[in-house]
Amino acid sequence: MKELNSTPSKRDKKTFLIHQFLFVILLATSYPTSVFSQTYRKIAGWSDEVNNRIESFLNTTLTMNNRKVAVFDGDGTVIGQVPYYLADEALYRYADKNYKDRNDPQAKSKIAILNRMVKDGNNVGKVYVEDRVHFLAGMTPAEIMDMGYECYLDSYQGKFYPEMKQLIANLKEYGFEVWILTASPEFLYQKFLAEELGLPDTQILGVKSVVANGRLTDEIIMPIPQDDGKANVIPTFIKARPLIVGGNSRGDMDMLNQSCGLKIVVNPDDTTIRGKEDGPMNGYTVKQYWGKRGSGHREM
């Protein structure tokens, strides 16, 4: 038997080098294709100027290796809330069905909370926001999710802004983590927002409270995502500074200022002059305030 030579011939070496060279070329040419395959889809209803600016910004993020985060307010930013906030509508509906005709201590306590909220009237104030959670205390997370989902199906389906859904789809195409940050109870909003926007429910953040023995308690977990608390939620729970932040109201101002890239102001109010309690927005409407900030934001 002829002894096999374990040493490659010159021809074998040449073939091996060619194959190796081809492999390197294929690797080098296929890599950019995977990195730069994102395609921006124009958002109908927004101007060419706005679309071009968003696309240009997204293209600057293509080579980023760190987390790309976008944060949006919920009520009034991604979904319309007229004439009432879904968070309030859901509570009133539930009380009408389950507590109205009862005289036991639990029912009286829940109705008293709603009466206090009506008397307060400031549905973006922290006390009002906390009272929503107090109303839900004692229920299971699943019951609260279903309450919000049923109210959405009955009264708010079709009120998502299509432009915002298109924007979020573009962001996902470019590899962004999209988070929704709302001052409404977290469990109440998670199910329908996650389903409509195609996001994990863990990326829907709202007012949190401790769950003990499978039921919501009155113990609220700080920070409350309203006003300055919204800005504090970002480093506390998201743990990354966002490249894009979008909101629509005074309560979103602090959160918007956390963006290190685009600030998107959706349907800003141009009627109510803000007071001293609104800090730097004092003397301006929401639209006027962001207008004077110059090109650091984009109004939709």
For each predicted feature, which ranges?
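N-terminal secretory signal peptides that target proteins for export/translocation
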Residues: 1-15
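Bacterial N-terminal signal peptides
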Residues: 19-31
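Sec/Tat signal peptide C-region and signal peptidase I cleavage site
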Residues: 33-37
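C-terminal cap/substrate-recognition subdomain and adjoining C-terminal extension
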Residues: 38-49, 53-55, 59-69, 141-179, ...
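Asp-based phosphoryl-transfer active-site loop
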Residues: 68-82, 256
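Solvent-exposed coil/turn segments that connect beta secondary-structure elements
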Residues: 75-77, 83-84, 209, 268-269
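Short, solvent-exposed loop/turn and secondary-structure capping segments
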Residues: 81-84, 90-91, 191-192, 258
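A metal-dependent, Asp-based hydrolase signature
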Residues: 83-158, 162, 166
